[in-house]
A protein has these predicted regions:
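Membrane-embedded alpha-helical segments of integral membrane proteins
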Residues: 19-83
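Post-HExxH zinc-binding segment in Zn-dependent metallohydrolases
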Residues: 139-143, 148, 250-294
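Transmembrane alpha-helices and immediately adjacent membrane-cytoplasm interface residues
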Residues: 73-78, 92-126
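Membrane-interface segments at or immediately adjacent to transmembrane helices
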Residues: 117-187
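N-terminal membrane topogenic signal
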Residues: 2-15
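Active-site recognition of the HExxH zinc-binding catalytic motif
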Residues: 58, 235-256, 260-261
Length: 360
C-alpha cells in the first residue's frame, strides 16, 4: 500500500491540497467577515489586475483559454487511452488517469470558488445600498410595467433602424461606450466606482447561443465577454450586466437591476433603449403571469418598431432550445444554487422585485 501511495504521491498530495481548500472554503463561507476579507482584500483586486492586463489585448483571453482547454483535453484523452492500452498493470494505470482527471477538476472547482464563489457570501449590492427585494403588489407591478413601456416607446425612436424597422446600431460602438455606462451611478452608489474594462465580443458566439448565453464574466482573466451573434437590441444591457459582475456582484438579480439602472440613466441612446427593453421584458413576463388582459393592454401600447424587435429576439432564441441549451442551463442553475442562491437561474427574472420596489 505504501509503495502504491509513493508511486502516485504527487497526485495524492495534489488531491489532498484541493480537498483542503474546498473544505476550508465550505467552513468559512458562513463567515461574512472572512468572505469580505477574501473578496475585497484579495480576489477582487486580483481579478481587476487580470482584467487590466487582458484589456490590452484585442481578443478575449477567456475564449482563447476555453479553446486551449478543449484542445488540451482532447490530446490528454488520446494520451491516456494510449497509456492504458500499453500499460501492463491496467488497474493501476486506470487509477492514475482517474486521479489526474479528478485533480484537475478539483483544482478548477477550488480556484473558481475562491475567485468567484466567495462573492455569493460577501456583502453585495443590496447590503451596501440598503435596497432589498420585497413582495410585489399587483397595482405596483402594473404601474411600473406601464412606466417602462412608455419610456421604451420614447427610446425606440432614438436608435438606428434598418429598412425593416429593426434595431441596427453598430455593435462595436456599443462595446466602445460600455466602460462609461456606470459613471451615472457613482453619485448615488459610490461603492460602484471601480475601473471598467470594456466587454469583448466572442468569436464563437453561435456556440454561446446554442448554450443560451448572451454573456459571461470570466474570473480567471477578469474579462466580461458578450455574444455578438444574438440580436443587437439587448447587447448594451448585456454589457452593463457583465460589468456589474466585474464589481464582484454575483447575484444575477442585482446585476440585471444595475444594468437596467445604468443603461436608462446614461447618455447613450442605444443603452437607453436596451435598458428600458430589458426591464420591460422582465416586468411584462411577471405581469403576464398575474393578469393577461393587463399584459395585452400594455403590449398593445408599444410602437411597431419595439414589437418587431421583440419578435426578432424571440425568433432568434427559438432556434436554440435543444439539448445543448437545456444541459448548459441546467448546469448553470445547479452552479448558482450550489453557492446558496435558491432561485438558481430564476434569479435573472427576480429583478422584478427590485425594479418595482425602486420605481413604484
Amino acid at each position: 500500500m505504501k509503495a502504491f501511495y509513493r508511486e502516485n504521491k504527487g497526485l495524492h498530495r495534489w488531491l489532498f491540497a484541493c480537498g483542503a481548500v474546498l473544505v476550508l472554503f465550505s467552513l468559512l463561507r458562513e463567515s461574512r467577515a472572512a468572505m469580505n476579507a477574501l473578496v475585497y482584500g484579495v480576489t477582487l483586486p486580483l481579478e481587476q489586475l487580470f482584467g487590466r492586463a487582458c484589456a490590452a489585448l484585442p481578443f478575449s483571453v477567456a475564449e482563447l483559454l476555453y479553446v486551449l482547454a478543449a484542445v488540451t483535453a482532447a490530446v490528454l484523452l488520446v494520451l491516456m487511452v494510449r497509456y492504458l492500452v500499453r500499460s501492463r498493470k491496467k488497474g493501476r494505470a486506470a487509477y492514475r488517469c482517474a486521479l489526474f482527471v479528478l485533480d484537475v477538476f478539483l483544482t478548477v472547482c477550488a480556484t473558481f470558488s475562491l475567485l468567484w464563489g466567495a462573492n455569493y457570501y460577501a456583502d453585495d449590492f443590496c447590503d451596501k445600498s440598503g435596497l432589498s427585494p420585497a413582495p410585489v403588489a399587483y397595482e405596483d407591478l402594473l404601474h411600473v410595467t406601464r412606466y417602462f413601456a412608455n419610456r421604451l416607446s420614447l427610446a425606440s425612436g432614438q436608435v438606428a433602424r434598418d429598412e425593416n424597422g429593426l434595431f441596427a446600431a453598430d455593435r462595436q460602438e456599443i462595446l466602445a461606450y460600455a466602460d462609461s455606462v456606470y459613471d451615472c451611478l457613482y453619485e448615488e452608489f459610490p461603492f460602484l466606482d471601480l475601473p471598467d474594462h470594456a466587454p469583448k465580443g466572442i468569436f464563437c458566439s453561435k456556440i454561446m447561443s446554442a448554450m443560451n448565453f448572451t454573456g459571461f464574466y470570466f474570473p480567471f482573466t477578469g474579462e466580461s465577454n458578450v455574444n455578438m451573434d444574438s440580436p443587437a437590441m439587448l447587447l448594451a444591457s448585456t454589457c452593463a450586466h457583465e460589468l456589474a459582475h466585474q464589481r464582484g456582484i454575483a447575484s444575477e438579480q442585482q446585476c440585471n437591476f444595475l444594468a437596467i439602472l445604468a443603461c436608462t440613466r446614461c447618455d447613450d441612446a442605444n443603452y437607453h433603449y436596451a435598458g428600458w427593453l430589458l426591464g420591460y421584458i422582465h416586468l411584462s413576463n411577471a405581469l403576464y403571469r398575474a393578469d393577461r388582459e393587463a399584459w395585452q393592454e400594455v403590449r398593445d401600447s408599444l410602437p411597431a418598431e419595439v414589437l418587431a424587435d421583440l419578435r426578432c429576439n424571440s425568433a432568434y432564441w427559438s432556434r436554440y432550445r435543444g439539448l445543448t441549451a437545456r444541459f448548459t442551463q441546467s448546469l448553470n442553475d445547479k452552479m448558482i444554487r450550489s453557492y446558496g442562491d435558491p432561485l438558481g437561474t430564476q434569479s435573472y427574472g427576480a429583478v422584478v422585485d427590485l425594479l418595482v420596489g425602486y420605481y413604484a
